[in-house]
């Protein structure tokens, strides 16, 4: 690996070209596959030839202040025929060096793209650096790069107040990309007002009452619901022009401190500024999307909440603002002549304020029972193994769900549910055998796919089969995503399962119009559902399986105008150009909603990988949500470090799944994944009623050889742990997680407790140190409790149970 003396200059305003003392730093988990080189005129280039994740840090860590406004300019050009896509983003850190966001201000790049954007340093950020990152081959010449501070939203400079309450509030009291107030906020005359407001984002306008928006018609149907009101809203743009707007519905809040309920274990009271809980969505909308389907706040002794109807979502975020005295939802909407309307539904409701966000979740579940409906009563582990016939002692592992169709009769005999595999938004095109190992460009891939499309026919070989290459190619012509320049979005790839081209597709069922051969029809084949599910459930095929449900490799936005009319859900807009686009979240939503409705109509089930992570709106249509997970990180020349999922992420997933099975597949280098790690994995999963299984470690050389259930050295070593923990996990999962714990309460924040069904409660030490906890037993007259992990009986004294738990250890109590 050659890293030349390519240097930057750091000035008071940031980074720009020149002589200095810092070099772009590559990172990649493969050796000898990335190089950074000097070019003429002070430019530089990079080339990555491997297949795994990579990054080139463009700057060192810069010291910044909240509220600082920066401009970022980058111009790239092609280096050679390697045209792989990559992204440019900022990595944010707090004052202690803890990473806060690895993909802030994310920009999708390709050689030849010029980016000029600005951002404001968010709350709590002390340092940041810029980087390129990607997956697979990529190369580009970087002709211009500049990161400069151009001002601050605080004219006199940022000074944090000394009072703890004000200091915390001031950290967020400025406009960011996702803010509601600040430079583009509510005018003073609208503060404290409720109702609908509209902002013309492209014109950098203020929020105005919807009645002042002459180009828009708003239709609202209001109806009573349990504890509140439902709003069925349609917005129509009348001019036929491309538009980018933010539609707001706000609830006025009374005077006094506002308690913002951010997570199930965290609430914050504030008196100035704004609070939001959202996740990055790249260049879609204003860049941030609400993680939860609802938001909750209490103020003046009253509880206020807003929530989205899962049958009619759009790109949205929630927040509470103490300055404007409003709880609000914002929808970032795009309009075009091909798609001039947007339809959303949401609720304005109340909840039990004493239970904070858990109380709001109870109320939201009551409003949306179908979202949390449990269709699968018997739970178990998930596997994607091609064959289980030769796995000895199969019953010890507790399998229930299979993401492969290779042994349907065997599955029926062993009470396993079999799901048919599809992956929305991708088409992995393997090159012809004679081309393998040779140079293959995206242009070559396009020509090859055109040949396949012309060849035909497009009929499926059978109702259960995957599509033929010819059928895929026909769908590709209709559904391929296009970037801001109108180019088809794809990349060359060399993976263990595909050497060739990966195309990214808009998989919504309406693309191309009625009867079109689009990606949805290619993969789901609705016309074959009667034949596919001809046997009575659970005999034969049991449902549909959606891999990569949150579409990790798909670009945030589809700019193809020919796709706009085919979307049922609202468009959004590109953050930087304000052009109307299709957000990939709604592509996944429309694909999974339509396919799941077909499956449920046949009495079948649905399984998905990689959700819920950032998107809540897929789970309502799933019966078995799951995710591959990575809880270990490779270290240097060998070994791994243990980095499990944190409580906040775990509770988000558990909350969105409700009583549905929450399944995991651990991906790890199993040469270094110890028996102790397996037990930690099982104990943490048990604490949340999740179902822990294993898969592999991805990569061309390790994928097949590292599959856990093909390694007797792993599964035989861990067999006693499966026999001990999986039955307990299944018992809790089938009992069903409860939002409010009416059995136990902990006095130690490092020791959490959750309830399952009517009689089970888990107690878990989150920390890496022993913890003592006093558990208040909430039901009266309980003298003893059965503990199921250590198989003991615990005595309750005066309504209290005292425990000392080792690090990362769980206990399960059964109430008689």
Each predicted region: which residue ranges?
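Active-site-adjacent "subsite" loops/lids of carbohydrate-active enzymes
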Residues: 420-538
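Asparagine-centered strand-capping/turn motif at beta-strand->loop junctions
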Residues: 134, 235-239, 763-767
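Carbohydrate-recognition beta-sandwich/jelly-roll modules
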Residues: 101-104, 148, 152-156, 161, ...
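C-terminal beta-strand-rich structural cap/linker in extracellular carbohydrate-active enzymes
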Residues: 797-816
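The substrate-binding groove and active-site-proximal loops of carbohydrate-active enzymes
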Residues: 379-388, 395-403, 499-535, 573-588, ...
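Active-site-proximal substrate-binding groove within the catalytic cores of carbohydrate-active enzymes
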Residues: 338-349, 354, 413, 584-776, ...
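Extracellular and organelle-lumenal recognition/adhesion modules and their flexible linkers in secreted
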Residues: 17-205, 226
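Active-site neighborhood of glycoside hydrolase catalytic domains
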Residues: 523-618
